[in-house]
Amino acid sequence: MTRSRTWSQHLEYPIVEARYELHVNAGAVIDAKIIGYFTDEFGERHEFVRWDKCHGQFHKHCLYEKGQGKDIITSPLAEAFNEAKSDLRENWARYKKGYIKNHLF
Protein backbone atom coordinates (compact mmCIF):
# COMPACT_ATOMS: atom_id res chain seq x y z
CA MET A 1 0.00 0.00 0.00
CA THR A 2 1.33 3.44 -0.94
CA ARG A 3 1.28 6.10 1.74
CA SER A 4 1.43 9.75 0.74
CA ARG A 5 2.26 12.81 2.78
CA THR A 6 2.12 16.48 1.75
CA TRP A 7 3.20 19.37 3.94
CA SER A 8 4.35 22.99 3.72
CA GLN A 9 6.97 25.03 5.51
CA HIS A 10 7.46 28.79 5.55
CA LEU A 11 10.99 29.78 4.64
CA GLU A 12 10.28 33.51 5.05
CA TYR A 13 6.88 34.11 6.62
CA PRO A 14 4.48 34.85 4.95
CA ILE A 15 6.08 35.37 1.54
CA VAL A 16 8.27 32.33 0.76
CA GLU A 17 7.07 28.76 1.23
CA ALA A 18 8.17 25.22 0.42
CA ARG A 19 5.74 22.41 -0.36
CA TYR A 20 6.81 18.79 0.03
CA GLU A 21 5.23 15.57 -1.28
CA LEU A 22 6.48 12.12 -0.38
CA HIS A 23 5.07 8.76 -1.54
CA VAL A 24 6.23 5.58 0.23
CA ASN A 25 5.44 1.94 -0.61
CA ALA A 26 6.68 -0.99 1.52
CA GLY A 27 9.08 1.34 3.35
CA ALA A 28 10.71 2.67 0.16
CA VAL A 29 10.29 6.18 -1.23
CA ILE A 30 8.80 5.75 -4.71
CA ASP A 31 7.99 9.37 -5.62
CA ALA A 32 8.78 12.81 -4.27
CA LYS A 33 8.34 16.47 -5.12
CA ILE A 34 9.55 19.73 -3.58
CA ILE A 35 8.40 23.15 -4.77
CA GLY A 36 9.74 26.53 -3.66
CA TYR A 37 7.51 29.51 -4.34
CA PHE A 38 6.82 33.04 -3.18
CA THR A 39 3.82 35.34 -3.20
CA ASP A 40 4.30 38.81 -4.69
CA GLU A 41 2.68 42.03 -3.51
CA PHE A 42 -0.32 41.38 -5.77
CA GLY A 43 -1.02 37.97 -4.23
CA GLU A 44 0.30 36.03 -7.24
CA ARG A 45 2.39 32.92 -6.54
CA HIS A 46 5.63 32.32 -8.43
CA GLU A 47 7.34 28.92 -8.44
CA PHE A 48 11.12 29.51 -8.52
CA VAL A 49 12.50 25.98 -8.07
CA ARG A 50 11.10 22.43 -8.20
CA TRP A 51 12.44 18.92 -7.70
CA ASP A 52 10.41 16.00 -9.09
CA LYS A 53 10.52 12.74 -11.06
CA CYS A 54 8.47 13.90 -14.05
CA HIS A 55 11.16 12.67 -16.48
CA GLY A 56 11.93 9.41 -14.67
CA GLN A 57 14.83 10.49 -12.44
CA PHE A 58 14.60 12.86 -9.48
CA HIS A 59 15.88 16.19 -10.74
CA LYS A 60 15.84 19.92 -10.08
CA HIS A 61 14.09 22.42 -12.35
CA CYS A 62 16.09 25.64 -12.04
CA LEU A 63 13.18 27.98 -12.75
CA TYR A 64 15.22 30.89 -11.35
CA GLU A 65 17.55 30.72 -14.39
CA LYS A 66 16.73 32.17 -17.79
CA GLY A 67 17.05 28.80 -19.54
CA GLN A 68 15.28 26.93 -16.72
CA GLY A 69 17.87 24.15 -16.76
CA LYS A 70 17.69 20.84 -14.91
CA ASP A 71 20.12 19.20 -12.51
CA ILE A 72 19.88 15.41 -12.13
CA ILE A 73 20.33 14.00 -8.62
CA THR A 74 21.67 10.45 -8.78
CA SER A 75 21.41 9.55 -5.08
CA PRO A 76 18.75 7.05 -3.95
CA LEU A 77 15.40 8.85 -3.86
CA ALA A 78 15.06 9.13 -0.06
CA GLU A 79 18.58 10.58 0.18
CA ALA A 80 18.03 12.86 -2.82
CA PHE A 81 14.81 14.18 -1.26
CA ASN A 82 16.71 15.13 1.91
CA GLU A 83 19.50 16.73 -0.16
CA ALA A 84 16.90 18.78 -2.05
CA LYS A 85 15.24 19.89 1.20
CA SER A 86 18.60 21.08 2.52
CA ASP A 87 19.42 22.82 -0.76
CA LEU A 88 16.15 24.73 -0.67
CA ARG A 89 16.58 25.77 2.98
CA GLU A 90 20.12 26.98 2.30
CA ASN A 91 19.62 28.68 -1.09
CA TRP A 92 16.00 29.85 -1.36
CA ALA A 93 16.91 33.55 -1.11
CA ARG A 94 19.36 33.28 -4.03
CA TYR A 95 16.88 31.26 -6.11
CA LYS A 96 14.08 33.76 -5.44
CA LYS A 97 16.34 36.70 -6.32
CA GLY A 98 17.39 34.99 -9.58
CA TYR A 99 13.77 34.30 -10.52
CA ILE A 100 12.77 37.93 -9.94
CA LYS A 101 15.78 39.21 -11.92
CA ASN A 102 15.32 36.81 -14.86
CA HIS A 103 11.53 36.60 -15.14
CA LEU A 104 9.83 39.59 -13.54
CA PHE A 105 11.99 42.53 -14.68
Residue ranges and their predicted role:
Residues 1-39:
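Negatively charged, low-complexity tracts enriched in Asp/Glu with abundant Ser/Thr
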Residues 28-69:
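A short, structured beta-strand/loop element
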Residues 54-105:
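Mixed-charge, Lys/Arg-enriched low-complexity segments
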